């Protein structure tokens, strides 16, 4: 039989105090909805239906054509939300997973185990449960003397005995699909919340003598539903440790997992070392044997093998093998550093292509430039690429020596093997094998300093 999935993503999430729909808040680089969607893939669903409502288009854009969508215009409870999928699924034969879009820690493995348990035990409904140290706020799983599930009781409807139960409903279920939609016709709003509870279908199945089971999670953390920023931070912490652990298993040294912020789609090669307080975001990819030292921050960066990045920022750039960056360097979007390049302390590079073995050791700005191989930038070099309205390009050949404190005013071309004298302002193209000097001639006026207040003779 086929598997199906319904993802509940219509809620506003008032306690988040945010303009974003709750499921759009991110955990480790992607939205909670995307985390859930990825985990759902483990059951190989023939169709996924996402129930949307608040700011529906934002939610729809996240999944695009990977899901069908149905609207829940009024928030009348989880049962009502599932009813919205009736037109898409009601006549289909198979098993339907129902899961909330704000449960980013649930794993695909657990969902696969849930489906297998449901099928193997021939249940009409199977509840995903967990044991909670503090079950307050959760629906409780009530069992009879034979350990069979008899019902789910919500917190506000639970009596004193039921509130002592530790086994909680995670809000994730598997149902026989056609039985689910038949039972939904019989639920009502006669409860403390005045809503259509999806949990009421469990009681309907039990009254009809149908088999209901429960599969208990091994890790309570997977059950976390995010309702506020506190829970969001908890989810982030758990996910961060999970990600760091997987990288360590794969041969990466993460010196302090508590302080490493690694997004879920980041790739890191073996023998690389991630020191404390490193942040790796987006689609960043790190090669083998690379060292990222304390405080480095990379966003959508492509980094090769045997690279050293010391307390620096790299954004949307390509760093080739053997490059050294930092400390305190800033590699801005659109930059490509070829093999063996050295970008030193307090150097900023933006939208530039830098050739092999080129060095900019300190206090330099290179913007909108194309630079050849074996170029040396002296300290204090500036490419002047912006006139207030337009950006202009600087082209520098190979084996060029740029003297310290040179100002290169674009558009400008400097040929191979050329050099600029220290302190020069270069406004014209420099031919191959030439030296360019663009500074005022020094004039010494002997004895002139005697008249100045700083001179000992004036004190």
From Swiss-Prot:
Region (Pyrophosphorylase): 1-229
Name this polypeptide is given: Bifunctional protein GlmU
Enzyme Commission number(s) of this protein: 2.7.7.23, 2.3.1.157
Molecular functions (GO terms): glucosamine-1-phosphate N-acetyltransferase activity; magnesium ion binding; UDP-N-acetylglucosamine diphosphorylase activity
InterPro entries recorded: Bifunctional_GlmU (IPR005882), GlmU-like (IPR050065), GlmU_C_LbH (IPR038009), Hexapep (IPR001451), NTP_transferase_dom (IPR005835), Nucleotide-diphossugar_trans (IPR029044), Trimer_LpxA-like_sf (IPR011004)
Keyword Metal-binding included in the entry's annotation: yes
One of the GO BP terms on file: cell morphogenesis
Segments for region (Linker): 230-250
């Amino acid at each position: 039989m086929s598997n199906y999935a319904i993802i509940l993503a219509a809620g506003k999430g008032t306690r988040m105090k945010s303009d974003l729909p709750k499921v759009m808040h991110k955990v480790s680089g992607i939205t909670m909805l995307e985390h859930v969607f990825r985990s759902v893939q483990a059951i190989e669903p023939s169709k996924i239906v996402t129930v949307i409502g608040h700011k529906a288009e934002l939610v729809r854009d996240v999944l695009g054509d990977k899901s069908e969508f149905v609207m829940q215009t009024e928030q009348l409870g989880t049962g009502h939300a599932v009813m919205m999928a009736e037109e898409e699924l009601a006549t289909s034969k198979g098993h339907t997973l129902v899961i909330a879009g704000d449960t980013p820690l649930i794993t695909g493995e657990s969902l696969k185990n849930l489906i297998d348990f449901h099928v193997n035990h021939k249940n009409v409904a199977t509840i995903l449960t967990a044991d909670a140290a503090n079950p307050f706020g959760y629906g409780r799983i009530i069992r009879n003397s034979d350990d069979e599930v008899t019902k789910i009781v919500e917190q506000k409807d639970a009596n004193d005995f039921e509130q002592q139960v530790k086994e909680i409903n995670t809000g994730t279920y598997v149902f026989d699909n056609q039985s689910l939609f038949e039972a939904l016709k019989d639920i009502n709003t006669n409860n403390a919340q005045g809503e259509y509870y999806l949990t009421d279908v469990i009681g309907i199945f039990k009254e009809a003598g149908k088999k209901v089971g429960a599969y208990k999670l091994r890790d309570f953390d997977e059950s976390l539903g995010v309702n506020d920023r506190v829970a969001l931070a908890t989810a982030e912490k758990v996910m961060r440790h999970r990600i760091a652990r997987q990288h360590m298993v794969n041969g990466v040294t993460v010196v302090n997992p508590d302080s490493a912020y690694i997004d879920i789609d980041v790739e890191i090669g073996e023998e690389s070392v991630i020191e404390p307080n490193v942040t790796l975001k987006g689609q960043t990819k790190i090669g083998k044997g690379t060292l990222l030292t304390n405080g480095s921050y990379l966003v959508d960066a492509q980094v090769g093998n045997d690279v050293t990045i010391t307390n620096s920022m790299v954004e949307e750039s390509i760093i080739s093998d053997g490059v050294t960056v930092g400390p305190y360097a800033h590699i801005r979007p659109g930059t490509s550093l070829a093999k063996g390049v050295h970008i030193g302390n307090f150097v900023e590079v933006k939208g530039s292509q830098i050739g092999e073995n080129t060095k900019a050791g300190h206090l330099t700005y290179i913007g909108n430039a194309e630079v050849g191989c074996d170029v040396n930038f002296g300290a204090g070099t500036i490419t002047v690429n912006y006139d207030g309205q337009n950006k202009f390009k600087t082209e520098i050949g190979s084996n060029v020596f740029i003297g310290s404190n040179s100002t290169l005013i674009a558009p400008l071309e400097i040929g191979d093997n050329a050099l600029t004298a220290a302190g020069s302002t270069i406004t014209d193209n420099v031919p191959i094998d030439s030296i360019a000097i663009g500074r005022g001639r020094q004039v010494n006026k002997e004895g002139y300093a005697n008249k100045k207040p700083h001179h000992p003779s004036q004190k």
